[in-house]
Amino acid sequence: MAAIDEKEYTQSFDWKIWKRLGPFLRPYRGAFVSMLVFNGICALVDVVLPLFQKYAIQNFIEKNTLTGMLPYALAYLAVILVQALSVVIFARNSMHIEMNLGKDMRGSLFHHLQTLSFSFYNVTPVGYLLTRVMSDTNRISSMLAWNFTDILWAVFYVLGTFAAMLALNWRLALAVIAIVPVMAILTGYFQNRILHWNRKVRKLNSRITGAFNEGITGARTTKTLVTEEQTADAFRSLTRQMHDSGIRAARLNAVFIPLVLFFGTMAVSIVLLRGGYMVLDQALELATLSAFTAYAVSIFDPIQMTAANLAEFISLQASIERVTDLMDEQPQIQDTPEVIEKYGDAFHPKRENWEPLRGEIEFRDVTFRYPDGGENVLEHFSLHIPQGTTVAIVGETGAGKSTLINLACRFFEPTEGQILIDGVDYRQRSQLWLHSNIGYVLQNPHLFSGSVRENIRYGKLDATDEEVEAAARAVSADTVVSKLENGWDSDVGEGGDRLSTGEKQLISFARAVLADPRIFVLDEATSSIDTQTEQLIQNAIDHLLTNRTSFLVAHRLSTIRKADVILVVKDGHFVEQGKHEELLRRKGYYHDLYSKQFAQESAARILGDGSAQ
């Protein structure tokens, strides 16, 4: 994933990238047009206001009279009211665009993420996704709604001001306009460098988000391994880099802003000096000089702001690329158009066309290698699993026990060969059809924030409270509920962190019972669980295995002995298969594994029973 984080995005303007925003912007064309019109009105009013100042000096101050003041005041008030109304309308439109555009982009991204394959989440850090779904979409919607507004106002205002200055006195106007190219070059020079460091800050912010997420979710591990200092040092290193980049940008700004003020002051000085002589020579009216001074004071801020915003827009292009790259990410496992037409997809399932699943599975001459792997993990592997068979997969940690399960669940597909479900190649059926018939309980099951009842109901969203409680009783998960202060409505915490591993497994078993899958997959927990909970878990497993085709990544001797077929994995390859007694008689790798690991478990149990007595 480092390659993803370090990708260098296009730095020059690329219209093709911006066109990708078209589908998101199209619903808000009316709001954009309205924003454009009323923004133009605001800029026009800002251009006109110094002319009111000129009129007041000419007609009231120089003539020392208030004749005509009331119509003047009413006209001035009307212009201010028009400006205020325009600000309200374009601000509402900008807010409407920002909120809805951000909502649409986040919704579309989240919808797309639901379609991506299991393998994508295996290699993609959560921080990477959070940055794109939240930070990048917020930045895009905010800049299009507000920075774009600022650019429009600045362009309208600068053009209007130039026109007004030229109309008032073209010689004096040219003296001010001559400074503009110098300001433009200066702004371009500094903004490019400021933008470079701001980009670095954003890139580091993405890494910090990921590191922060890992630091919080892994806090227990950090504390138990006493690695707080190392974790904090690594986090501090990232924040220090971000701090240093931010300081560099701030230093450039500290030089740039005074230079802008200097040239702005120079423009005003030129107007006052040259204009003053022209007033003395009666070549220019004092009222006109007053208006000119107001224009000279105000014209350079919009120019500088426009340059800064344009630089930010080039930077924004990287955010658009990051979001669209994620949108372009394709599921590794995809149903064919014919399958989707018949069975539907994850968001539009055609359940009426789904055939009942019995649970007969056949691996037929399957060869498989992982997409990023060079060698085959399986070669010409064949196995017939009748309906209701329990298959235990054993092997040392890291041996590749999950490969067969990933293939059976269609998280990956065979490189060669076929996998048949009920006699039909599972690629001829939809993924949703298969996954809706699979109950998957992980070593450390994931529970969602919410109550125990809500977590069990994830197995069947329309289940009644009675069905939820019956499913829990079937696997003794009600014993967990009885210990909780608020019973079924107790909050399990984020990820279920208020429950022990054993309790989370029991809740997951209840969820699986409620879903009533025809295929059950269990990755047994390797962590130690108290004897009482372990017995409850074993009873729950026995209940779930009944009349279901089951795959068990097994660690307990009692589970393995009950299996109809044991598959033995070594270095990513299946080296033996058979029943427990048969494999022991062969005195092969399973026998060695049993002697080293499972005999120790038996001895530990005997010692435990003896001490208990």
Task: Name every feature range the model reports, one short phrase each.
Residues G22, P27-G30, F118-S119, S135-L144, ...:
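An intracellular "coupling" helix at the cytosolic face of ABC transporter transmembrane type-1 domains
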Residues V37, V45-L49, S86, E98, ...:
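Hydrophobic alpha-helical transmembrane segments of ABC transporter permease domains
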Residues E62-P71, A164-A178, R248-E321, L326-M327:
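Helix-loop-helix
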Residues Y343-Q613:
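ABC-type nucleotide-binding domain
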Residues F32-I89, L166-R171, Q282-L286:
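Transmembrane helix-loop-helix hairpins at lipid-water interfaces of multipass membrane proteins
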Residues I17, L25, F90, S94-E98, ...:
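Juxtamembrane loop-to-helix connectors within ABC transporter transmembrane domains
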Residues L113, F235, V323, F363-D365:
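Conserved catalytic Walker-motif region of ABC-type ATPase nucleotide-binding domains
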